[in-house]
């Protein structure tokens, strides 16, 4: 399978996942720890670029985007998502509890004490998956109008 990672990067990441140190990996591969460090760093950079690419692509193809405004109570987010998905006739693949968990894991930096402190966007894909990303990032990708949902 084609990938943004080289075989060596994949091997290094697999060994790191198994708990090996960079020194141990360097000994296994017959190279220096500094080289392994650079290989791992570039692999992680490539992974981040791939994630960003997917985020941009999902933003482009998404039939529905919801701006979650500053001051929104976190507990109202599932209702907002379900309301928008019903309007768009998209079945969201998650329950309210799963959405709350998803928001907690993926939008922590936008939330404090149950309240949204920085606006963000929830993207709903046609297949019912949801993603969270920066509001500014979404504006750049599609010049999304600033309106309350």
Curated annotation (Swiss-Prot):
Task: Provide the alphabetized UniProt keywords.
Answer: DNA-binding, Transcription, Transcription regulation
Gene Ontology terms, MF aspect: DNA binding; DNA-binding transcription factor activity
- SUPFAM superfamilies named among the record's database cross-references: DNA-binding protein Tfx
UniProt record, GO biological process: DNA-templated transcription initiation
Reading the lineage from the top rank, the first entry is Archaea
UniProt keyword Chloroplast present: no
Function, in words: Putative transcriptional regulator.
Give the family this protein belongs to, as stated in its UniProt record: Belongs to the Tfx family.
Protein name from the UniProt record: Putative transcriptional regulatory protein MMP0086
């Amino acid at each position: 399978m084609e990938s943004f990672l080289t075989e060596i990067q994949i091997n290094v990441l697999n060994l790191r996942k198994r708990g090996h140190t960079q020194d141990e990996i360097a000994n296994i591969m017959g190279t220096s720890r500094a080289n392994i460090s650079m290989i791992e760093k570039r692999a992680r950079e490539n992974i981040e670029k791939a994630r960003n690419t997917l985020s941009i692509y999902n933003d482009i193809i998404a039939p529905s985007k919801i701006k979650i405004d500053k001051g929104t109570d976190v507990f109202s987010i599932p209702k907002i998502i379900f309301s928008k998905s019903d309007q768009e006739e998209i079945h969201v693949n998650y329950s309210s509890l799963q959405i709350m968990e998803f928001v907690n894991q993926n939008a922590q930096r936008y939330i404090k004490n149950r309240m949204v402190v920085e606006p963000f966007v929830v993207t709903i894909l046609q297949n019912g998956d949801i993603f969270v990303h920066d509001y500014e990032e979404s504006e750049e990708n599609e010049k999304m109008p600033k309106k309350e949902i």
